[in-house]
Amino acid sequence: MATAVRLPPEIIDLEDFTEYMNWLIFGHMGSGKTVIAGQLPGRVLILANEKGTIAAKRQGSKAKVWKISRWEDLVAAYEWLANLDEIPFDWIVIDSVTDMQYKCIRWIMRNVVLASPQRDEDIPAQGDHFKWQLSMKRMVADFNELPVNVLWTAQEMVREDPEGEDIILPLIEGKDYQIASWVCAQMDVVAHLANKTVKKRVNGQVQKVFVRRLTVNESPPIFAKDRYDVLGRVVDNPNIAELVQKVLDSETGRPVKKTASRSAARAGATKRTTAAKKTAASRRRVNA
């Protein structure tokens, strides 16, 4: 008789495997990114380092907020989440990756000057650039591997692609736009948010109306993507809870009545996979 093989905790039943969502919404300051993030369904924790959380509060968001003033605060938030047996949130929002990158650079240069007082805190050397690029990539990967849905926000930048055409991307510096492209590759949805005045027919007449437009599939010069292929190309005045529900419906092949019920099912799977997640997280810590 064959001896039963004891499987490592990293191997689980397919029915217990939960694929969490990783989204990125980018746009100009004041376009409403944080307001939309604050309207995510379920229990939301915003890791906030920009003032957009005030606007989210005014719109009635019930999200919790963890103030991120320095890179070390972000590391502390990650460490806390990674070491929980069960994360008590449905979504973690990092607002924004653009500002987090600035805080990462400041953290690196503070340490550089402590070790070498003759160095200028405002002039990174080549090795310092490599360090913050790798630290940013590690940070994004680590948060995205947590057993929870994650939404990032970012400001926008314009770069020139290899054909000489403009491309609008999340503002993440490094190697022209290679680091920004790498971050986008880690996401299931990359969407661009902008405030626009468009012509629409209202009561039989064409009028100019203000809309908040979310571009969710590539529309040159804007880079965007929807891995689920269910969100369309553009969404005016988006309701992010409805967009999340579309994705959940596409996963099951039928409407899901309540996100909360799905969260409860995920909680059971999370308990069974906590050991595996913690092992992976410990190997790939945010470097602080």
Regions found by a protein language model. Give the residues of each.
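Conserved, well-folded catalytic cores of nucleic-acid-processing
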Residues: 80-84, 103, 153, 186, ...
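Conserved GTP-binding G-domain of TRAFAC-class P-loop NTPases and closely related GTPase folds
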Residues: 158-270
